[in-house]
A protein has these predicted regions:
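Conserved alpha-helix/loop element of class I SAM-dependent methyltransferases that forms part
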Residues: 22-41, 57
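Class I SAM-dependent methyltransferase SAM/SAH-binding core
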Residues: 45, 51-102
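A conserved beta-strand element that flanks and buttresses the S-adenosyl-L-methionine
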Residues: 119
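Conserved Class I S-adenosyl-L-methionine
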Residues: 202-279
């Protein structure tokens, strides 16, 4: 029963991404709809676009748009190019100082003077210099353009009941893992945007609880099996690290109990997603 959670095949990863799209669309689809519909044919920059699936989901119902997606992971860009015919996809890193000069020639080719929407979904937590990156992005905004920042803050994350403290331990494991990014990024977004020169900063959404979903198992499917795969791979990559071995074995031994918790009527799980817009 446990072994089926110890790896994610390509098909399972595709399924996880579909779940992620469904969950996050439920979380803040209205924010994106309002931003996209401010202009008849919005020019959109999707920062950290990955395979492009999330943005394509958000753009459903938008008749006309111009899209450029950027990601520093070349493999993801190759997938986006093969999967989506609408839009341009580039291997670029927004944290590089020359990012604006690198993307402007492509903007000119696409007839884009400035972006009406710049989307940063789950990327600021991984930035070394968020203010610098956001400042560069601001120079690419069109007049009256909007930046959308969706990120996470584990201070908003909780699970209850948690008598065995399994979820408490899991949250601590995530917070102590530098490769997971800044797990308290969400509370800093307003300050980052202010220092980067943005105005009219608004916080639209705070926290996504399982009680707001028709099927709260979606939150389990979104996060938990993928994390187990991550901890397994980290252990396999560094087998001599006893702490990482211990983390993986604990996760492996407790994942079924965590799933059982999600299936209980009185259980609630909250993920710390946040959504800001600024101009």
């Amino acid at each position: 029963m446990i072994s089926k959670y110890t790896t994610l095949t390509g098909a399972e990863e595709d399924q996880r991404l579909d779940v992620q799209n469904s969950v996050l669309c439920h979380f803040d689809r209205d924010v994106y709809d309002n931003v996209f519909r401010k202009k008849e044919c919005p020019a959109i920059l999707d920062v950290g676009c990955g395979t492009g699936n999330m943005m394509q989901k958000m753009l459903e119902g938008i008749a006309s748009y111009k899209l450029i997606g950027v990601d520093k992971v070349e493999r993801q860009i190759h997938i986006a190019e093969k999967t989506h015919t609408s839009g341009r996809f580039l291997t670029l890193d927004v944290e590089q100082a020359d990012f604006p000069s690198m993307i402007r020639p492509v903007m000119e080719e696409e007839g884009i003077d400035g972006f009406d929407v710049i989307n940063c979904s789950m990327v600021v937590l991984h930035m070394q210099n968020p203010v610098g990156a956001l400042s560069r992005l601001r120079t690419l905004l069109a007049p009256n353009g909007t930046v959308v920042v969706r990120d996470i803050d584990d201070g908003l994350q909780y699970a209850w009941p948690d008598q065995e403290r399994r979820f408490e331990k899991l949250f601590m494991m995530l917070e102590n893992d530098e490769r997971m990014g800044d797990r308290h990024c969400g509370r800093k977004i307003y300050s980052y945007l202010t220092k980067a020169g943005f105005q009219n900063i608004q916080l639209h959404k705070v926290g996504l609880a399982s009680t707001s979903l028709k099927d709260k198992m979606l939150l389990f499917d979104l996060a938990i099996p993928t994390l187990l795969h991550y901890y397994e791979q980290r252990h396999l990559d560094t087998p001599n690290n006893m702490q990482w071995k211990e983390d993986f074995e604990w996760f492996r031994d407790n994942i079924v109990a965590m799933k059982d918790s999600f299936g209980k009527e009185d259980f609630v799980f909250s993920a710390g997603f946040m959504n800001f817009t600024a101009e």
